[in-house]
């Protein structure tokens, strides 16, 4: 259940971070609401996962999910371009997240 909550926390972080891209001052309220709720749910799920998982592992996986997820959305949705070095770095983050999951005792 802790790993499930950690994945949910990562997904909520992605949603909140993408909502930040749409904030343009005071004209649109929905991005601010989505961002606030998203980060709130993300931190709550992360805190619940940290009850069972080591804090360092949980935090590293959470940030990894967020980094890879936001980058993927940027690539697909916003048509952002990446250099080869950035793609390699994201792959290393993914490998680290997978390694932490496979070697975690919880």
From Swiss-Prot:
Domain of life the protein comes from: Bacteria
GO biological process: transmembrane transport
GO molecular-function terms, A-Z: transmembrane transporter activity
Classification lineage: Bacteria, Bacillati, Bacillota, Bacilli, Bacillales
InterPro entries tied to this protein: Small_drug/metabolite_transptr, Small_multidrug_res
Main localization category: membrane
Transmembrane segments: 3-23, 29-49, 50-70, 82-102
Single GO cellular component term: plasma membrane
Family: Belongs to the drug/metabolite transporter (DMT) superfamily. Small multidrug resistance (SMR) (TC 2.A.7.1) family.
Subcellular location: Cell membrane
Organism: Bacillus subtilis (strain 168)
Topological category with respect to the lipid bilayer: Multi-pass membrane protein
Name of the featured protein: Uncharacterized membrane protein YvdR
Keyword terms: Cell membrane, Membrane, Transmembrane, Transmembrane helix, Transport
């Amino acid at each position: 259940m802790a790993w499930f909550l950690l994945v949910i926390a990562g997904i909520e972080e992605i949603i909140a971070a993408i909502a930040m891209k749409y904030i343009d001052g005071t004209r649109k309220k929905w991005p601010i609401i989505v961002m606030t709720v998203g980060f709130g749910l993300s931190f709550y799920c992360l805190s619940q996962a940290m009850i069972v998982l080591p804090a360092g592992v949980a935090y590293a996986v959470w940030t990894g999910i967020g980094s890879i997820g936001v980058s993927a959305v940027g690539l697909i949705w916003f048509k952002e371009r990446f250099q080869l070095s950035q793609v390699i770095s994201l792959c290393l983050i993914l490998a680290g997240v997978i390694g932490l999951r496979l070697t975690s005792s919880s």
